[in-house]
């Protein structure tokens, strides 16, 4: 019988804390445990501390996970809670993504200062985003506006917008909903036209391979449909060596038996893009994503990535 609290690792941002509290509450309810049986351990990551440069410049997605993973591997944490889209496709040896919570809305949200929609921004307007995918998609749709790198927590980005530093910004709608800020967006973007990042809107829990006690605990909150969809999307990303240096979009939908995936790769300036759609058995989700990646890479040709990466 567990007598000491389970130690949950997380970043300290308001969004990370909201995701961790949701995970803790689901675990407590699933196992009939009081919330006090889960101790939340807040760690600062390099990605949190360096906010004046793009992720591509300072090392990519692993900057939000490295400190948490070190504590997991040392045994100081029992598991860690992350935004799935922040996770590198290659994890440290001995760790894996044990569980995925039911997925939130996958869409991107536009927040405009004056213009309510992305298409309504005047020529020469400025939009801030830290995501190469969002930057490329904006340039694809609106080559007449300026896109600047714009990092920070959700609240920081919205404050900069209110101060007039930019005319608009894009945020994951899932994050806004988790923060109780679903009223903030002025437009929700159609994923057919503005596809999300792979794994966007999904919370994942990272744990040690072979830690049966913890992984049995986490299995109670794992959502199979989300697990299948995100596995497919991460398979696509991994095949394309996806990181914060690559504009890659994609999302999968699973009904438990069948899964459909749509993906896109773009040049950073948004002038060239390639798309892929594929479907298959949900049981083959990761392999299906890998196949989609192989097909779109062949479609784009060998010079596509080397021409700008």
UniProtKB/Swiss-Prot annotation:
Protein name: Porphobilinogen deaminase
Gene encoding the protein: hemC
SUBUNIT field: Monomer.
Keywords: Porphyrin biosynthesis, Transferase
UniProt-listed Enzyme Commission number(s): 2.5.1.61
Function: Tetrapolymerization of the monopyrrole PBG into the hydroxymethylbilane pre-uroporphyrinogen in several discrete steps.
Top-level taxon of origin: Bacteria
Additional remarks: The porphobilinogen subunits are added to the dipyrromethane group.
Catalysis: reaction(s): 4 porphobilinogen + H2O = hydroxymethylbilane + 4 NH4(+)
Assigned protein family: Belongs to the HMBS family.
Modified residues (S-(dipyrrolylmethanemethyl)cysteine): 244
Xref: InterPro entries: HemC, Porphobilin_deaminase_cofac_BS, Porphobilin_deaminase_N, Porphobilinogen_deaminase_C, Porphobilinogen_deaminase_C_sf
Matches recorded under NCBIfam families: hemC
PANTHER family named among the record's database cross-references: PORPHOBILINOGEN DEAMINASE
